[in-house]
């Protein structure tokens, strides 16, 4: 289990309660389903440093942690230095949108516990990301 997986597990404890799900309409995808979905992708995606990945409803990072793990492994030949490889993945390949500020803080702690990376996280509803606000009524 990676450091990020352990941190995610810690953040999930007590967070994914019925009350939280009811109040925030949050339901987290179980890791085994994420693995199953990602297994359907062409294996070459894990060794391509030019690919970008978007999690439009990032939550606590369930998808991102597993994608990060696969990219760290798949990009070894491209970048042998593990620290530079992880930095490239987190700063240039992974992008997140999450509208719950509490979840964003937890996501930052999971992916960047020591604050060393510049993560790409927008605390906003993905469906309105990049739209100009308008006062017009339709």
Predicted feature locations:
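SAM-dependent methyltransferase catalytic region
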Residues: 2-138
């Amino acid at each position: 289990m990676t450091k990020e997986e352990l941190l995610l597990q810690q953040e999930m404890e007590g967070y994914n309660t019925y009350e939280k799900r009811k109040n925030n309409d949050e339901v987290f995808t179980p890791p085994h389903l994420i693995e199953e979905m990602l297994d359907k992708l062409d294996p070459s995606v894990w060794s391509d440093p030019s690919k970008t990945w978007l999690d439009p409803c990032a939550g606590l990072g369930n998808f991102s942690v597993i994608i990060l793990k696969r990219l760290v492994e798949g990009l070894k030949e491209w970048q042998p230095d593990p620290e530079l490889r992880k930095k490239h993945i987190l700063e240039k390949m992974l992008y997140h949108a999450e509208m719950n500020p509490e979840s964003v803080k937890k996501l930052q702690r999971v992916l960047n516990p020591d604050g060393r990376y510049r993560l790409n996280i927008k605390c906003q509803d993905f469906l309105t990301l990049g739209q100009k606000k308008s006062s017009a009524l339709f």
